[in-house]
Amino acid sequence: MKLSKDLWNERYENQDTGWDIGHISTPLKEYFEQLENKNIKILIPGCGNAYEAEYLYELGFKQVHLIDWAQKALDNFQKRNPKFPKSQLICGDFFKHQGQYELIIEQTFFCAIHPDLREKYLIQMKKLLAKNGKLVGLLFNDKLYSNRPPFGGKKSAYMPLFSKYFNQVSMEKAYNSIPSRADRELFIRIENK
């Protein structure tokens, strides 16, 4: 299966989005609710239908930027959130994106890219995170699939990979995952020191 812009757009066009839970995940919701600085610049790569961005915007975070290959996913988001600034919706390649962000949210993007791209993902994250910026989100702690998304993995493989690029890496079992993902997710907090 070739993972291309056309494939992802087609999946959104056909509503073939089995990973989409239809709302923000509980671990991220609770994390966002404790954030105090509403002026931080946030990026959500591989944002899909972007329920996280919708929730952040409702909380008063106005510098939320979304990037996805699939224009249909961004269109879905814009339809639900017509007041969200169009200039902060980017249809493009995460690996070519430029900018600096205080917070980057990981929610099913890492598992959607081929495992061969994981090191490239971390190099790009390092470039996009401002000094003391954070990468926060969820990773599957489950084997899942090796030939198609969602590509899985285990904490034992993630830690050395993430630690190669970041010296502040925390990965803990998510205690508040939705039932279908219980005991299968890691909540990650990575700081760009």
Regions found by a protein language model. Name each.
Residues 1-99, 113-193:
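Class I (Rossmann-like) S-adenosyl-L-methionine-dependent methyltransferase catalytic domain
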Residues 108-112:
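Short catalytic micro-motifs in class I SAM-dependent methyltransferases
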